[in-house]
Swiss-Prot record:
Protein name (Swiss-Prot/TrEMBL): Ribonuclease 3
Catalytic machinery residues: D50, E122
Biological source species: Dehalococcoides mccartyi (strain CBDB1)
UniProt entry keywords in alphabetical sequence: Cytoplasm, Endonuclease, Hydrolase, Magnesium, Metal-binding, mRNA processing, Nuclease, RNA-binding, rRNA processing, rRNA-binding, tRNA processing
GO MF annotations in UniProt: double-stranded RNA binding; metal ion binding; ribonuclease III activity; rRNA binding
GO cellular component: cytoplasm
Location of this chain's protein in the cell: Cytoplasm
Taxonomic classification: Bacteria, Bacillati, Chloroflexota, Dehalococcoidia, Dehalococcoidales
Quaternary structure note: Homodimer.
Ranges where the DRBM domain occurs: 160-229
């Protein structure tokens, strides 16, 4: 058995059942060359880890972004759980060093193959989940995925509210929304603009921002929320 103390330190987890972590590192190629090994490969744990990772991020996104719609939430989750993200995290904790690989797989640089790294990392998450439970697994994931989560935060602030509002108003009212700056204040280097979104003689909402574009975007966001809330209220009648 490999000494996995360094890996445990990287994960921030001391296993009650170290055999679970070892199991998570066993590739099918190693099992093929060691048929007497009783516990098999890490594939079943990979399945569980994938599910745990998905539900933890789904829960986080749902609570962090209450104003973002299902389609965007799905896109954000996909960014977080995609193979590239898993590989980056796996490389960051030097996971490939600990993999149990068959000789041929090892010679063919299997310790650096994205599929091997991503699968083993998901299996490691399953091992943590089984050994420590959901809360500890959540803490590990949020710490290791900090960079990916910061990227999602940035993306969430750049959602095209104006396009979504236009689609909604055109579909519901057969009107095209327009924007105008109605006021501004402050010195030239630090202006605060007020914009409103309207169609014909109807004003839907207003928003503010440090640029005209930001003010228009915020006006669209407010209007979109109002429209969506009104549709929800109608559905509940």
């Amino acid at each position: 058995m490999l000494d996995l103390t360094e890996l445990e330190n990287s994960l921030g987890v001391k296993f009650e059942q170290p055999s679970l972590l070892e199991q998570a590192l066993i590739h099918t190629s190693w099992v093929n060359e060691n048929p007497n090994h009783s516990s098999g490969s890490n594939e079943r744990m990979e399945f569980l880890g994938d599910a745990v990772l998905g539900v933890i991020f789904a829960d986080r996104l749902y609570h962090d972004f209450p104003d973002i719609q299902e389609g965007d939430l799905t896109r954000f989750r996909s960014l977080l759980v995609r193979r590239e993200s898993l590989v980056r995290v796996a490389l960051g904790i030097n996971l490939g060093k600990y993999l149990y690989l068959g000789r041929g797989e090892d010679v063919s640089k299997g310790r650096f193959k994205p599929a091997n790294l991503a699968g083993a990392f998901e299996a490691v998450l399953a091992a943590i989940y089984i050994d420590k439970g959901m809360d500890v697994t959540r803490e590990v994931i949020f710490r290791l995925f900090k960079t990916e989560m910061e990227r999602v935060q940035t993306l969430s602030s750049n959602i095209d509210y104006k396009s979504r509002l236009q689609e909604l108003i055109q579909a519901q009212l057969q009107l095209t929304p327009r924007y105008r700056i109605t006021n501004f204040s402050g010195p030239e280097h630090n202006r605060l603009f007020i914009a409103e979104v309207y169609a014909e003689d109807r004003v839907f909402a207003e928003g503010s921002g440090r640029s005209k574009k930001e003010a228009e975007t915020n006006a669209a966001k407010v209007a979109l929320q109002q429209f969506e809330n009104s549709f929800t209220d109608e559905d509940n009648i």
